[in-house]
Amino acid sequence: MERTLVIPRGMWEGLRPSLFPRDGNEGFIAGLARPCPSWNGIRYVLEKVLPMARDGLEYSLPAGVGLSREESSRINVISAKSARYGLVPVHLHSHPAGIPDFSGYDDQKEEELHSWLKEEGQPLLLSLVCSREGSPRARLWMNGQQEACSVRIGLQTFFPVSTPLIQLQALDRQRAFGQAFTTAVSRLQVGIVGVGGVGMPVAEQLARSGFCNFVLMDPDKVEAVNLNRLYGLSARDIGRYKVDVAAASIRRACRSAGTKARIRAFKADINTASTRQNHILRRCDLLLALTDDELSRITCLNLALDGGLEYLQAGVLISQEKGTGRIESIKTEVTGAEVGRYCPLCCGRLDPGQASIEARRYVGGEVWERALSEGYIPEEPAPSVMSLNAIAAGALVLEIQKRVAGLGMADLMQQDWLTGKTLHVRNAERHLTAGECVICGRQAA
């Protein structure tokens, strides 16, 4: 069973000043993680950082850090009680440059703490160490023993030193993303909800870059109007389920890359998916909402944040002037979400009002007919062309590759290919107005 300590990228960046003080001394942080089942083991997602008392450190030196007795007791009590809520205590501390691993002193103190926590009913203890300019390393204390544990910052995975790295000739040109890139993507499980004009090329591009574990969900079949914008389709594919077409494309791509595809495909609507189907999606590491309506994207967003998954959505929009049909904008967009920081609802990229209107479809009858008659639901589908879908798909896949390789992340990218206007936001929470979000948990500024 693989175990991974997951820290959202934005949270990690926020912790760095405390973990690596400007005076060069060591830093210490305590937090709580939530265990989330994954396909190959358990993800421990860091969700809560325990605030440190102003005088909580007894000493902080270039080669050592220690808590006061009062602060240590307070954190230990919280750590023990966290077991009642299914949470796991996490201790993070830094080392000087050149000392990348846990010290003998770390071993002794953590073993003593783990023994005490077990007696208090908390069977687990996670610990992380990171040297300045180095990579984080983690371990899990369980049953009196140390267990190997990977670290994932956002989508960037740091493996234990003993982990063998995958090398494939077909993927050699991706070496710029780092030696561990192929190994990392081969272990990530990707859920794709919506495998239409954007979702299908995203699936193939990911497969050709080494991803091989997929969960696909889409209730629709291929229609004649899809043939101009879905890769590799012909008239013979009309009537086939899109998830079956996408699965076949992924398998071909994986064979070309030298990997073996593992796919679960559901011919289901995310808004009416079964408990089992949602449970399987929840085990993914990354969830992509590539549908064309607000309701399904909000459903995906809730599922991802609740399950500790990385979330991204992408789409296209060709807007036309009412009456004349004149094109006013041609846009592609990629955005994401992070617990406690931002989400598409905070940023105005999803409209809950429109989602409530779309929900009337599932009520049916007079409710749906009235929504149609009053113009809340477009009578014609939005324009869509293969070239624009390909740009959105490529932008999304590149964003995923950047995140896996540790090359930074964008919270929101939008490009209007008609006017040339570009929006590229890295720290979305800094641009949001005061207020709280019940979806991502962002607190008032």
Regions found by a protein language model. Give the residues of each.
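Conserved beta-strand-loop surface patch within small alpha/beta domains used
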Residues: 1-90, 96-158
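N-terminal charged helix/coil linker that caps or initiates catalytic domains
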Residues: 139-190
